[in-house]
């Protein structure tokens, strides 16, 4: 039915053990998975995800090594299918939920990510959903929303102006709701790349590009002095 999908792969490493990988798609019957009872992967007969891998098994000499499974859900009026939960299993085959995605923005970008049931990270997007502009660890979306107010909702669809950039950093880094959070923020030149990154300590790293949009240098400012971290030089093949 879907001859373009990779179903089975065999690897012959140097130690001569036979490693096989099997892939399952929305039109396949999933194997029996220990530790979980739900069987609906959420894609159904979705025509836009025919090549999306739902589960992958890796075996060594036909013995299970690991397995990963993704459940999906619909966002943006259920028109867009995105990961809902990710499960992983070791050689015992018992699936454990390792990642959960409770919230997405209107562009289908993950906004809140929960790992291992307790480690929460919020990722905010802007530039009409094209780029992540903030990563807040050890915080929930509700806490971030309280810190930012209406900016949390308007940020994805806008363009990050200098004024919004200052407000975003100030609110995220000074809010009482985020006193235990680790905040990293990113500013971009659209269609070129990142131009500034501020780490959880409040230190900025800058990125500069040439007229062709290629990364020219990465630097920081220490004591008012520019300190290069990386410098790139581009030449044609025959250019000396």
Residue ranges: model-predicted function:
Residues 1-115, 119-199, 203-240:
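Beta-strand elements of repeat-based all-beta scaffolds
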């Amino acid at each position: 039915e879907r001859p373009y999908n990779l179903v089975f792969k065999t690897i012959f490493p140097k130690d001569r053990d036979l490693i096989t990988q099997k892939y399952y798609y929305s039109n396949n019957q999933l194997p029996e998975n220990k530790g979980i009872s739900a069987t609906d992967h959420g894609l159904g007969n979705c025509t836009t995800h025919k090549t999306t891998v739902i589960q992958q098994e890796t075996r060594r000499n036909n013995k299970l090594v690991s397995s990963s499974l993704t459940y999906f859900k619909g966002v943006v009026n259920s028109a867009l299918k995105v990961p809902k939960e990710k499960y992983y299993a070791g050689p015992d085959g018992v699936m454990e939920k390792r990642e959960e995605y409770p919230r997405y923005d209107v562009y289908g970008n993950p906004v809140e990510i929960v790992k291992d049931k307790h480690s929460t990270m919020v990722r905010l997007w802007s530039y009409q959903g094209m780029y992540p502009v903030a990563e807040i660890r050890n915080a929930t979306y509700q806490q971030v929303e309280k810190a930012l107010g209406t900016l949390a909702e308007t940020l994805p669809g806008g363009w990050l102006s200098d004024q919004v950039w200052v407000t975003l950093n100030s609110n995220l880094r000074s809010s009482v709701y985020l006193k235990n959070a680790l905040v990293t923020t990113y500013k971009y030149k659209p269609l070129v790349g990142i131009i500034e990154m501020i780490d959880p300590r409040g230190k900025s790293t800058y990125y500069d590009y040439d007229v062709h949009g290629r990364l020219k240098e990465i630097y920081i400012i220490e004591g008012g002095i520019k300190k290069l971290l990386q410098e790139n030089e581009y030449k044609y093949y025959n250019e000396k």
